Amino acid sequence: MAKYCLKKTSKRVSCAKRYKIEKKVRDHNRKVKKEAKKNGTTNKKEKTISVPNSCPFKEEILVQAEQEREKIKVRQEAAKEAAKIHRIEKRKNNLPANFESMVAKASKQGTEFDKKVASAAEHEKFNTLDDKTIKAYASEVRKTVEIADVIIQVLDARDPLGSRSKSVEDQVLKGGKRLVLLLNKIDLVPRENVQKWLEYLRGQFPTIAFKASTQEQKSNIGRFNSAILNNTETSKCVGADIVMKILANYCRNKDIKTSIRVGVVGFPNVGKSSVINSLKRRKACNVGNLPGITKEIQEVELDKNIRLIDSPGVILVSQKDLDPIEVALKNAIRVDNLLDPIAPVHAILRRCSKETIMLHYNLADFNSVDQFLAQLARRIGKLRRGARPDVNAAAKRVLNDWNTGKLRYYTHPPEQGTAKEDIVVPAEVVSQFSKEFDIDAIAEEQNQIVEGLPMESDIIAPHNSDEEEDDDDEMETDVNEKKQTVTSGRKVKGPTKDDDKPVLPESLALEGNVQLNKLIKTAIKKQKKKSKKTANRADKLSDSLGNMLGGDAMEM
């Protein structure tokens, strides 16, 4: 063992001490550089001029090089002095000479600021409501209504009244055309809600429950028959056969021998192009979850008797009656083009329960919209410089979840005659439309589709705003809004309390169907495996004991 005096001192120090030393070194070096720059001295050594001894004119070359070096130094000093003088003059020119010049400068800056504000307002107007674009889209919709014989208005099943256009319906009725309401996206709402909306809307116009296909292939798009809707999460189309039947009934009852044109209209992003692709069973129109994909009318031949007309989505409402927040919540404007995405989030949090939002995004309790967006920004990693949360990015994330259906919601139909949105349709018109399309003949198939939807308890945890009290003004429930339920589409991960229970077939729950033979065979099989393992262990143990006893006998 080495002597104690020969052992070297360990260089290991604590991290705090090492960081402290490094910080002091940095501060010292910074101070030295600052002093050197102030005094005009530098530690940088000048590069020596080296000339080979074999050169015949070495002395003259060295003298000439020194003279050039001095000239370069003089030019650099002169440039520094000129730059210093220029900075001083510029600083003097920026200072106002008198009160009048100060006022003129302030007015100039105010004019520049007003120009910036005006340009920002024009940019917001362009992103939200472009008058030329709206007029162009509106003319395309009017053209569709004029040339079509039957109009199918596609509604979002989550908010049918919010996606319904009264002006389009008035144009259809004035033109003597036939109108059919198609309730799309029924897989996003519970069964009871769909039944109530069908009952409410059928009192005004013929209404069909529908689910457009979400498959991405170009052809052979799948569809379900109305009687076998057993998977609510399928990407196939549901209800296409019923649409074809009512159109065929209309042609037969009106004795139309030639083809008819069917116009498909509706708000942006309600699924008009997806409905046409589902009926055609191939990708005939471009689709996407962003508004403005369809920019002009497009005619698609369904068969020899039916031609479908796809129209661009537009909200035909006067600009003074148009609420920009409602437009954003209906996905009529691209989320990336919104200059203030936080305002729609206020409306979302007024319509849904705090527990639903906390469960969906896995957040702690919050008392305001700003606090919620700050927590969500940290949760999804949207941070600015200095670890400040990017609330705008978090608000856009919430809007995207709202528009794509991840944050599920649905509205409740109003009572007959109590809603401001009620459209009064004469009873003669309702009965005439029902007879022409023979709605009673497809009632049974419609009921089968609705019965195949999940119950409210399967996917929905309804929020009752009367059971909660919130002291914060920003989180207060908006009583003027339509009755609406918002739920989380987030699935709970991880083990549950029922994981420890044995998994048994569902058929055993039926009375008189216990499958005794199958259970007996399974139990016998497990018992055989267990006895076989026990026998193997006993054999190994006996072999080891025999070897030990044999070795002891040989030694004796």
Curated annotation (Swiss-Prot):
Record localization: Nucleus
Entry comment, domain topic: In contrast to other GTP-binding proteins, this family is characterized by a circular permutation of the GTPase motifs described by a G4-G1-G3 pattern.
A Pfam family the protein falls into: GN3L_Grn1
Listed Basic residues bias regions: 525-535
Coiled-coil portions: 58-95
Domain CP-type G positions: 138-317
Gene3D superfamilies: 1.10.1580.10, P-loop containing nucleotide triphosphate hydrolases
Keywords: Coiled coil, GTP-binding, Nucleotide-binding, Nucleus
Compositional bias annotation for Acidic residues: 466-478
One Gene Ontology molecular-function label: GTP binding
Name of the protein described by the UniProt record: Guanine nucleotide-binding protein-like 3 homolog
Sequence similarity: Belongs to the TRAFAC class YlqF/YawG GTPase family.
Region annotated Disordered, chain positions: 29-50, 461-508, 525-556
Gene: nst-1
Major localisation: nucleus
GO cellular component assignments: nucleolus; nucleoplasm; nucleus
Binding positions for GTP per the UniProt entry: 184-187, 266-273, 310-313
